[in-house]
């Protein structure tokens, strides 16, 4: 409800009159009461709401993904005319969007599945918007979407037509998967700085403030520096009293499931999903900590050197995560005939969304130099960073393993990097085993 309200207020602030409807009369009345003088027109029946709109109607749905979206669409259909446009701005599974697009197209309606990133504040002030559906329908809503979207530093709106049917929601799903990876990498950096150097919260905030001035400059690093020094009403550091169980809404899982369907090695992001799952086993972990032995973390010898190694490992890990994510976008584009523009996608992530970061421009640059590049690690800038930073990543992972600090995404990053650069892998033995017990046959070199 908050996302819908904030998007309505965002649209209204651009000079539009906005019809609003919620199943709950009270919620509709509440929005109107809280926003006196705004050009928000309340409606209390679906019929009245639909009939208030000029044709072709442009209806933005912000409902919980799943059955709720289908029932909302079903309630609208009796009152729609051919050519009307429904925009689904929820966190919808892309296969559902493909299905709804097909069904609504058959009835003569347009359906635009749209990823919206930036949270409640982004919805109000300017989100990153990822629309997919009929191109001609997108053209009819593009002026509004461009006005309400976030603006990058160069003034460009963070919205672009992504592709047919489920393309927009797919890109939003991968965005969320990358977000999982970014957050877990940062959490592991935090664990290393606490475990290896016993940094205080103030020192952590100072370190992250410095990191945010350079290559790692991003929304997530920026908010993390603030989180470290936030105190509760008792004067305790808030982060230190928050239970170490990370919840999830399932979008990271969807990204990993899709990687398995496509045969894409999305190892880092998938490890970040698993890390949340193992965090939720709190009671088991507490019990296991009293039974299972392991090394006690020994302090790192050189403080400044260790901090720099962790910074480099974090940046290279981030690059590997995005390389995997964009490789999966390419596989999905081929599978679903979307013709995705990867440089354009990186561009619309530059502002408004949770993964906004300075280095996204480097991704756009890489695709502008070579649109057909198979993997971002092969682009000159990212190859150079890998050359320079891989030793730090290796050292940090080795330190973590020796000292019993779990770093699943850092470990996944170096394993993927080494696998990807290996001309020969031991998979020949696996294939021989498969042929031995199942006559699966094999190819000769």
UniProtKB/Swiss-Prot annotation:
<keyword id="KW-0570">Pentose shunt</keyword>
<dbReference type="InterPro" id="IPR008927">
    <property type="entry name" value="6-PGluconate_DH-like_C_sf"/>
</dbReference>
<feature type="binding site" description="in other chain">
    <location>
        <position position="180"/>
    </location>
    <ligand>
        <name>substrate</name>
    </ligand>
</feature>
<dbReference type="InterPro" id="IPR006113">
    <property type="entry name" value="6PGDH_Gnd/GntZ"/>
</dbReference>
<feature type="binding site">
    <location>
        <begin position="63"/>
        <end position="65"/>
    </location>
    <ligand>
        <name>NADP(+)</name>
    </ligand>
</feature>
<dbReference type="InterPro" id="IPR006183">
    <property type="entry name" value="Pgluconate_DH"/>
</dbReference>
<feature type="binding site">
    <location>
        <position position="434"/>
    </location>
    <ligand>
        <name>substrate</name>
    </ligand>
</feature>
<feature type="active site" description="Proton acceptor">
    <location>
        <position position="172"/>
    </location>
</feature>
<dbReference type="InterPro" id="IPR006184">
    <property type="entry name" value="6PGdom_BS"/>
</dbReference>
<dbReference type="Pfam" id="PF03446">
    <property type="entry name" value="NAD_binding_2"/>
</dbReference>
<feature type="binding site" description="in other chain">
    <location>
        <position position="276"/>
    </location>
    <ligand>
        <name>substrate</name>
    </ligand>
</feature>
<feature type="binding site">
    <location>
        <position position="91"/>
    </location>
    <ligand>
        <name>NADP(+)</name>
    </ligand>
</feature>
<keyword id="KW-0521">NADP</keyword>
<dbReference type="InterPro" id="IPR013328">
    <property type="entry name" value="6PGD_dom2"/>
</dbReference>
<dbReference type="GO" id="GO:0019521">
    <property type="term" value="P:D-gluconate metabolic process"/>
</dbReference>
<feature type="binding site">
    <location>
        <begin position="22"/>
        <end position="24"/>
    </location>
    <ligand>
        <name>NADP(+)</name>
    </ligand>
</feature>
<feature type="binding site" description="in other chain">
    <location>
        <begin position="117"/>
        <end position="119"/>
    </location>
    <ligand>
        <name>substrate</name>
    </ligand>
</feature>
<feature type="binding site">
    <location>
        <begin position="1"/>
        <end position="4"/>
    </location>
    <ligand>
        <name>NADP(+)</name>
    </ligand>
</feature>
<dbReference type="GO" id="GO:0004616">
    <property type="term" value="F:phosphogluconate dehydrogenase (decarboxylating) activity"/>
</dbReference>
<dbReference type="Pfam" id="PF00393">
    <property type="entry name" value="6PGD"/>
</dbReference>
<feature type="binding site" description="in other chain">
    <location>
        <position position="91"/>
    </location>
    <ligand>
        <name>substrate</name>
    </ligand>
</feature>
<comment type="function">
    <text>Catalyzes the oxidative decarboxylation of 6-phosphogluconate to ribulose 5-phosphate and CO(2), with concomitant reduction of NADP to NADPH.</text>
</comment>
<dbReference type="InterPro" id="IPR036291">
    <property type="entry name" value="NAD(P)-bd_dom_sf"/>
</dbReference>
<protein>
    <recommendedName>
        <fullName>6-phosphogluconate dehydrogenase, decarboxylating</fullName>
        <ecNumber>1.1.1.44</ecNumber>
    </recommendedName>
</protein>
<keyword id="KW-0560">Oxidoreductase</keyword>
<keyword id="KW-0311">Gluconate utilization</keyword>
<dbReference type="GO" id="GO:0016054">
    <property type="term" value="P:organic acid catabolic process"/>
</dbReference>
<feature type="binding site" description="in other chain">
    <location>
        <begin position="175"/>
        <end position="176"/>
    </location>
    <ligand>
        <name>substrate</name>
    </ligand>
</feature>
<comment type="subunit">
    <text>Homodimer.</text>
</comment>
<dbReference type="GO" id="GO:0050661">
    <property type="term" value="F:NADP binding"/>
</dbReference>
<dbReference type="InterPro" id="IPR006115">
    <property type="entry name" value="6PGDH_NADP-bd"/>
</dbReference>
<dbReference type="InterPro" id="IPR006114">
    <property type="entry name" value="6PGDH_C"/>
</dbReference>
<feature type="active site" description="Proton donor">
    <location>
        <position position="179"/>
    </location>
</feature>
<dbReference type="GO" id="GO:0006098">
    <property type="term" value="P:pentose-phosphate shunt"/>
</dbReference>
<comment type="similarity">
    <text>Belongs to the 6-phosphogluconate dehydrogenase family.</text>
</comment>
<feature type="binding site">
    <location>
        <position position="440"/>
    </location>
    <ligand>
        <name>substrate</name>
    </ligand>
</feature>
<feature type="binding site" description="in other chain">
    <location>
        <position position="249"/>
    </location>
    <ligand>
        <name>substrate</name>
    </ligand>
</feature>
<comment type="pathway">
    <text>Carbohydrate degradation; pentose phosphate pathway; D-ribulose 5-phosphate from D-glucose 6-phosphate (oxidative stage): step 3/3.</text>
</comment>
